[in-house]
Amino acid sequence: MFDKNNLKLYFICGTQDIESKTTIIDVVTEALESGITMFQFREKGNGALIGDEKEDLARKLLALCHDYAVPFIVNDDVALANKIGADGIHVGQDDMDVKVFAEQFKGKIIGLSISNIDEYKTSNLAHVDYIGVGPMYATTSKDDANLPVGPEMITKLRAHVNHFPIVAIGGINVENTREVMQAGADGISIISAITKSENISNTISQFLQNVE
């Protein structure tokens, strides 16, 4: 069951985002202990795991998230999400149409990326629980990221979607979080600000203060 409070501090990562001095299990464990509200497994890019290795890691992370009662979302990979019993799936505009797999995910969380008003107008949100809007600012975490749309895009979308849950993503850090929240976001998605942090617990504590 989806609760928009899950979006408050939504951590996204895969092995490609992790510094060599640590492991994804260690990073996600510390993030969970520190208070993230949802986790998305996004295994993409150079050196990303595939096949059985990807599935094995996904199962470990799923179990870890459930230890902390935090929803575990899979990015794009509908087959994997279905196979391991993930709590949900997040897809982009170029991925499979939501209505194609929505039947398989009844009772699960479905997220969709939207970057602008045109994408909103052509998206069927009937089966979608939340939309991810961005990138807010320039980001280095995604090789395929669009140009920044800024927090003002959230304000524009709010005029169309009313109270529909929105999570902001892209280049968000402790300093600009309040600006994003004031624009109308229900929460923030974070990758590198957590994975590259020297003190994950402290970073997450600051984020949680700023999303309130």
Curated annotation (Swiss-Prot):
Pfam families: TMP-TENI. One of its GO terms (cellular component) is cytoplasm. 2-[(2R,5Z)-2-carboxy-4-methylthiazol-5(2H)-ylidene]ethyl phosphate binds at T139, T140, S141, G171, I191, S192. GO terms for molecular function: magnesium ion binding; thiamine-phosphate diphosphorylase activity. 4-amino-2-methyl-5-(diphosphooxymethyl)pyrimidine binds at Q40, F41, R42, E43, K44, N75, S113, K142. The keyword Cytoplasm does not apply. It catalyses: 2-[(2R,5Z)-2-carboxy-4-methylthiazol-5(2H)-ylidene]ethyl phosphate + 4-amino-2-methyl-5-(diphosphooxymethyl)pyrimidine + 2 H(+) = thiamine phosphate + CO2 + diphosphate; 2-(2-carboxy-4-methylthiazol-5-yl)ethyl phosphate + 4-amino-2-methyl-5-(diphosphooxymethyl)pyrimidine + 2 H(+) = thiamine phosphate + CO2 + diphosphate; 4-methyl-5-(2-phosphooxyethyl)-thiazole + 4-amino-2-methyl-5-(diphosphooxymethyl)pyrimidine + H(+) = thiamine phosphate + diphosphate. Belongs to the thiamine-phosphate synthase family. Condenses 4-methyl-5-(beta-hydroxyethyl)thiazole monophosphate (THZ-P) and 2-methyl-4-amino-5-hydroxymethyl pyrimidine pyrophosphate (HMP-PP) to form thiamine monophosphate (TMP). This is Thiamine-phosphate synthase. It comes from Staphylococcus saprophyticus subsp. saprophyticus (strain ATCC 15305 / DSM 20229 / NCIMB 8711 / NCTC 7292 / S-41).
